[in-house]
Amino acid sequence: MSVIKDMNIIKTIRTHSEAINSLLICKNGNLVSASLGKIIFYDKKNLDVILRITEFKQFYISHIIELHKDNTFLFCHNGFLVFETSEDNKKYKILYSFYERFVFYKSIEFDYMNKINSEINYSIIISSTYGINIFDSGKNEDMKTGWSSIKTLNNNESVYNIFKLDNETFISTSNSTLAGGNNCLRFWSYENYTNIKTINNLTCSPGTSSIVKYNERILLVSLEKITYFGTKNLPNEVNNINGIAVLDLKYLEVVQYIEMPNKIRSLLLTKNNTILAGSVFNVYQFKFNKGNFDIISEKELFNYINNIIVEFEENCFVIGSINKLIFVLR
């Protein structure tokens, strides 16, 4: 088990002039970071810069993913853009771009069986200030054509985060402090895009990594504040508490909350089955113990807001900060 208090910052990367909004470990092991108008690829051996993309200066790049096709990436802005790189990620070209009048935040890709021809097709689900936007890309072998908007799920609320729970279900979180609507978490069906259940009055953190699935039974969601629970195991009102909600996936309800001294912006399930949580001041490590998550260690990171955490390799973590820096801990 890694112990954060014994870790050292082995590298500080100063490649961005704006907040780090997204980090990604590519399928080939290289690292990608994204901020306002800038995407940077780093070599997996020593984290040296191998590709710097700066032509998207007008885009607020909120999230980047690698699609089912290797070395093909999609990032969100006022719409989304698809590009591919060479196998070593040192060259790139744009494949497709879609623009919208509102802001796109986070995207997930899922595959499904086409009932007509029994082929595997792909769709992209994207959260936005206008709700949830679904694009069907069909087989989309060249990634240049076939993209079509097929549905928008809108409950008069801004949806910041979405999370792929399994092959049948995804989750969305809405935050009224962003652009109106409810503070809630919703479970959705992939098959027909119906709302399975809504948990109201959860003010979820706006970060794109604020949800993590611990196992088949437990889901963790970081909260801006805890305002109301109303389950049989918790008090009816708990006001203005920063922390993490623990959800039981069998019953789809909150069963525990972990009160924290600061707002939690990011969550990560590590390869050794502990949870890392990035806050305004610290990175915390949790362990599941007798039905509860207990803090077992913490690491102060110079008062930087830790926006997103990825595991670069076992016991080596990369943390992206709102304060423009990237830290590597081992």
Locations of the language-model features?
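WD40-repeat beta-propeller superdomains and closely related acidic/aromatic-rich repeat-like regions
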Residues: M1-R330
